[in-house]
Design a protein with these regions (language model features):
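Intrinsic structural disorder
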Residues: 1-2, 80-83, 134-137, 163
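C-terminal helical cap(s) of enzyme catalytic domains, especially alpha/beta-barrels
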Residues: 1-6, 48-49, 140-163
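Conserved anion-binding
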Residues: 4-115, 119-124
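Glycine-rich phosphate-binding active-site loops on the catalytic face of alpha/beta enzymes
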Residues: 36-42, 88-94, 132-155
Length: 163
């Protein structure tokens, strides 16, 4: 309920293997703008989910990129609004580690995407080597003083280095 009171155009709900009913309920109550799907959702699930959501809610499908990642994601092109590429791990959620971003230069990415996974001040220069630049960067643990607490000074430095 508190989230629904926030007047912001970038409210993102992050879900891992949740039911369609639960995602739709939370999306409506919280007045989410984006739904980020981090689990094992397939095309049938996403199609059913999109039919339950307001047309204004944008869907982001997360792909966890590792050494054996299969880039057969074309089935999702027309079902979601964005992709998000993150580092693969045994558990769901952030690891603070990067994957080899050069892999993105070897594939055609048909829709806008976000990049996540270990982005830091130390590796910011590597972002410029990606041919098809991401729409946005999902920075997190490398820019926190403790879990959930952002280091605004680091974020300001990062932002200035991106220019």
């Amino acid at each position: 309920e508190e989230i629904s009171e926030i007047n912001h155009q970038g409210k993102v709900g992050v879900f891992v293997n949740e039911t369609i009913e639960r995602i739709a309920e939370i999306s409506e109550k919280a007045k989410l703008n984006f739904i980020q799907l981090h689990g094992d959702e397939d095309e049938e699930f996403i199609l059913s989910l999109s039919q339950r959501l307001s047309k204004e809610v944008k869907l982001i499908k997360v792909f966890r990129v590792g050494e054996t990642f299969n880039f057969q994601f074309s089935i999702f092109n027309s079902l979601v609004d964005y992709f998000l590429f993150d580092t693969d791990s045994k558990a769901f959620g952030g690891t603070g580690k990067t994957f080899d971003w050069q892999i993105l230069n070897e594939i055609e990415i048909p829709i806008l995407y976000f990049l996540s996974g270990g982005i830091s001040l130390e590796n910011i220069h590597q972002l410029s080597t990606i041919n098809h630049q991401p729409l946005a960067l999902d920075i997190n643990s490398k820019f926190e003083t403790e879990p959930g607490i952002k280091n605004l000074e680091k974020i300001k430095i990062f932002k200035s280095l991106l220019k």
